[in-house]
């Protein structure tokens, strides 16, 4: 087993958002969490990413309990959070910069720019890209983190149908 969530619960301002959520995700599985706006999808991802603390419940990766932020997870929030003063290649390679392996990160990123529909935009700035291209850059940045588990919040929200199907 790769990921296990047990009895996850959280409420905000006396409103129960998640209550006793249990699930498992096996290695190699892709899981989509669907539901109406406000039902707790983003909240669950924020808890898994270590950005929010649940009231109770546990998270396990390979049977080891995980608390807070963990290198097991790479999180892509709904907003792309691209740094406006950095080029797309520099934004995509932030993980490499943090971990002092920028040249390796750039090599990996450049190989994926075409796959993500970003070829030719390596030196562009975020404000020069469409919303869909910004979203793809954020997705690529997350994919390059070398995490075991990708947590993607609305990864295809700003993409047109053709690009969504290609991804």
Predicted features along the sequence, with ranges:
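A short, proline-enriched helix->beta-strand linker immediately N-terminal to the Walker B motif
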Residues: 144-148
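The feature captures the beta-strand-to-loop junction immediately N-terminal to the Walker
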Residues: 34-36
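Conserved ABC transporter NBD signature motif
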Residues: 57-69
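Helix-to-loop junction immediately C-terminal to a conserved catalytic motif
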Residues: 49
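Conserved ABC ATPase "signature" region
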Residues: 103-121
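Catalytic Walker B motif of ABC-type/P-loop ATPase nucleotide-binding domains
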Residues: 150-153
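Conserved ABC ATPase signature
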Residues: 125-129, 133
């Amino acid at each position: 087993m790769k990921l296990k969530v047990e009895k996850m619960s959280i409420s905000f301002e006396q409103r129960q958002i998640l209550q006793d959520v249990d699930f498992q995700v096996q290695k190699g599985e892709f899981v989509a969490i669907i539901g109406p706006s406000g039902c707790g999808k983003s909240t669950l991802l924020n808890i898994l990413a270590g950005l929010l603390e649940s009231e109770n419940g546990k998270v396990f990766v390979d049977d080891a309990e995980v608390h807070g932020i963990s290198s097991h997870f790479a999180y892509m929030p709904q907003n792309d959070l691209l740094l406006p003063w950095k080029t797309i290649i520099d934004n995509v390679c932030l993980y490499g910069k943090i971990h002092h392996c920028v040249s390796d990160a750039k090599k990996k990123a450049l190989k994926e720019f075409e796959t993500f529909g970003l070829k030719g935009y390596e030196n562009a700035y975020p404000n020069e890209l469409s919303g869909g291209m910004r979203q793809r850059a954020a997705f690529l940045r997350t994919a390059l983190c070398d995490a075991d588990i990708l947590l993607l919040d609305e990864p295809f929200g700003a993409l047109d149908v053709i690009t969504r199907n290609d991804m």
